[in-house]
């Protein structure tokens, strides 16, 4: 998200996560496995994870975790895919409505923060003026929730610089 050069680090992570592509034990894990396959540019693993999760989401089940797949897990995963493919507007459309429900997926606040960062970056990079305005609102919200965050301050400056020239 921040443009940091990672080299082949995602390939190393994918070596560990790939074998869990079809596990679907925790949606939180699924999203992180997806991030590793997207980062490694492994389209086959990405498609396999999404396809098997979609199939499980269609089947009625009593598993609480999988019951969240249609409303939270799949839109979140798809938002990552859309962002990776340069479809920032679509990523915002998928992620913005569910942002406050993502706590149901588990993980710590810090671990879930990557989802907030994705939404902010997608909105910042959107072609839509309304979504760019949303990015600034999300950054103000983040600044209140995480005061004195250097990353938030950098993003606020970036938004001001990029969008004031548009």
Each language-model region and where it sits:
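Solenoid-like repeat scaffolds
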Residues: 14-26, 51-68, 96-109, 137-148
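"A position-specific structural signal for the A-helix of alpha-solenoid helical repeats
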Residues: 31-32, 36-39, 72-84, 114-125, ...
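Generic long, charged, amphipathic alpha-helical segments
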Residues: 57-77, 81, 86-122
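Amphipathic helix-loop-helix modules that constitute alpha-helical solenoid scaffolds
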Residues: 1-9, 22-32, 47-77, 81
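Residues that mark the junctions of alpha-helical repeat units in TPR/alpha-solenoid scaffolds
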Residues: 26, 45, 66-67, 71, ...
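Generic structural hydrophobic/aromatic packing signal, biased to beta-strands
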Residues: 1, 13, 17, 34-36, ...
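Helix-turn-helix repeat elements of alpha-solenoid scaffolds
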Residues: 2-13, 38-56, 86-96, 130-135
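Eukaryotic acidic, Ser/Thr-rich intrinsically disordered low-complexity regions
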Residues: 135-166
């Amino acid at each position: 998200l921040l443009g940091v050069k990672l080299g082949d680090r995602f390939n190393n992570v994918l070596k560990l996560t790939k074998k869990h592509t079809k596990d679907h034990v925790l949606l939180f894990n699924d999203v992180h496995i997806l991030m590793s396959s997207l980062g490694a540019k492994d389209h086959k693993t990405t498609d396999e994870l999404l396809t098997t999760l979609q199939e499980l989401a269609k089947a009625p089940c009593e598993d609480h975790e999988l019951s969240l797949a249609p409303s939270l897990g799949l839109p979140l995963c798809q938002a990552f895919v859309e962002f990776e493919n340069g479809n920032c507007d679509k990523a915002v459309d998928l992620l913005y409505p569910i942002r406050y429900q993502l706590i149901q997926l588990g993980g710590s606040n810090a671990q879930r923060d990557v989802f907030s960062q994705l939404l902010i970056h997608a909105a910042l990079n959107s072609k839509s003026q309304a979504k760019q305005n949303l990015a600034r609102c999300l950054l103000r919200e983040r600044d209140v929730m995480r005061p004195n965050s250097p990353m938030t301050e950098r993003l606020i400056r970036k938004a001001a610089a990029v969008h004031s020239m548009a």
